[in-house]
Amino acid sequence: MSEQQMTNEAAKTLDGWYALHDFRTMDWASWKLLSSDERQSIIHEFTGLLEKWGVAQKEGKGSQTLYSIVGQKADFMLMILRPTMEELNQIELEFNKSRLAEFTIPAYSYVSVVELSNYLASGDGDPYENPHVRARLYPELPESKYVCFYPMDKRRSGNDNWYMLSMEERRNLMRSHGLIGRSYAGKVKQIITGSVGFDDYEWGVTLFSDDVLQFKKLVYEMRFDEVSARYGEFGSFFVGNHLSLDTLPQFLYV
């Protein structure tokens, strides 16, 4: 392999479940015009959808979670993981056809696939048969109290072009970057989804924790790592609180 080919060698990825982050804003003014019985009927229909989608998680064929979003960017986020893009689209359509969707306004969405790169991969055999790898590619989304989502790119400008680095340089940088993430094991669960060709950024990062301050600490610490400081470009950050079937009615109460 030539030196130029080595320089431009692309990282290979292991790909798992497809992911949809669907952010909605409630039309509270229209929602308030409904009678209490009408609202309860709509909430009942929506919880029925959530329970239906939850069957896939029990069967190990996907996962989903719901969070209320803090701030003006959105009111809630539905995150869905499924084996195929078709199943992801089907759930999106099911929600869009529901009565609750009539009282929501799309705020933002992100389409991607759970991804592991070969920067840090090692070992022999089929990685898709490795239980540790499978748990990361096909995760059950936790019911952590808090979530943080943001999209990101690797910079491609001037002397700070990630894609002009050799595989060895990128691997070394990602190794030190990964050490920071692993230092938060037990405090933050991180799911990386790849979105090159799927959405406007290259990756989506979803963080879960029972201590919301861990998001701030983790992201801030990573800012000093060269991968983020020199090559990272970030989109909007969304932070929210977990919504369960028990707390959903209170969220929608007016």
From Swiss-Prot:
The keyword Nucleus does not apply. Fe-coproporphyrin III acts both as a substrate and a redox cofactor. The active site is at Y150. It comes from Bacillus subtilis (strain 168). It catalyses: Fe-coproporphyrin III + 2 H2O2 + 2 H(+) = heme b + 2 CO2 + 4 H2O; Fe-coproporphyrin III + H2O2 + H(+) = harderoheme III + CO2 + 2 H2O; harderoheme III + H2O2 + H(+) = heme b + CO2 + 2 H2O. Keywords: Heme, Heme biosynthesis, Iron, Metal-binding, Oxidoreductase. This is Coproheme decarboxylase. Involved in coproporphyrin-dependent heme b biosynthesis. Catalyzes the decarboxylation of Fe-coproporphyrin III (coproheme) to heme b (protoheme IX), the last step of the pathway. The reaction occurs in a stepwise manner with a three-propionate harderoheme intermediate. Gene3D superfamilies: Apc35880, domain 1. Belongs to the ChdC family. Type 1 subfamily. HAMAP family: Coproheme_decarbox_1 (MF_01442). InterPro entries: CHDC, ChdC/CLD, Dimeric_a/b-barrel. One of its GO terms (biological process) is heme B biosynthetic process. One of its GO terms (molecular function) is oxidoreductase activity, acting on the CH-CH group of donors, oxygen as acceptor. The keyword Oxidoreductase applies. Fe-coproporphyrin III binds at R136, Y150, P151, M152, D153, K154, H177, Q190, S228. Its EC number is 1.3.98.5. Pathway: Porphyrin-containing compound metabolism; protoheme biosynthesis. It is an enzyme of class 1 (oxidoreductase).
